[in-house]
Amino acid sequence: MTPTQKDGPRSNQDIRVPCVQLINDEGQHQGVVATQEALAMAAEVGLDLVEIVPNTEPPVCKIIDLGKLKYQTQKKAAEIRKKQKVIEIKEIKMRPNVDVHDYEVKLKAIHRFIGNGDKVKITLRFRGREMAHQDLGLKLLQRVKEDTSEIAKIEAEPKLEGRQMMMVIAPK
């Protein structure tokens, strides 16, 4: 019968080596000690013997509260997950003959998205005869590029895909 695999470091009776490098509950190095003696020292202060570095010879063990160690490990993992920022791609849709005020509103939105650390995909949709004036769309995207040059860099240059011209910018 095989023992079930526990999560986390080995502790107390799970440590099966004859001797360990011991660090006491105050963080002082005690040297190489017999495992049974280390277990007795841990029991004396009411704490657990926990294997910190298992792949050394002999393994490094520390006298510490196992519940507290698991709690701190979970807390660190949660903190790391919280700090991770998922970069989203926000999309701004425009037409080639956009009005001045509409352009300014779209530009404010682009600035807000870049300020939040997101990438922005600017899409120009051409309808009907507008396809004959792709140069207007390219000029508009160049204008967006110039207006956002101090806060963003171009990740994907303007390119035409079907009836749409698109460009992707990212925060600097």
Swiss-Prot record:
It is found in: Cytoplasm. Its main location: cytoplasm. Gene3D superfamilies: Translation initiation factor 3 (IF-3), C-terminal domain, Translation initiation factor 3 (IF-3), N-terminal domain. It comes from the Bacteria. IF-3 binds to the 30S ribosomal subunit and shifts the equilibrium between 70S ribosomes and their 50S and 30S subunits in favor of the free subunits, thus enhancing the availability of 30S subunits on which protein synthesis initiation begins. The keyword Protein biosynthesis applies. GO terms for cellular component: cytosol; membrane. This is Translation initiation factor IF-3. InterPro entries: T_IF-3_C_sf, T_IF-3_N_sf, Translation_initiation_fac_3, Translation_initiation_fac_3_C, Translation_initiation_fac_3_N. Belongs to the IF-3 family. The keyword Aminoacyl-tRNA synthetase does not apply. Monomer. Keywords: Cytoplasm, Initiation factor, Protein biosynthesis. One of its GO terms (molecular function) is translation initiation factor activity. One of its GO terms (biological process) is ribosome disassembly.
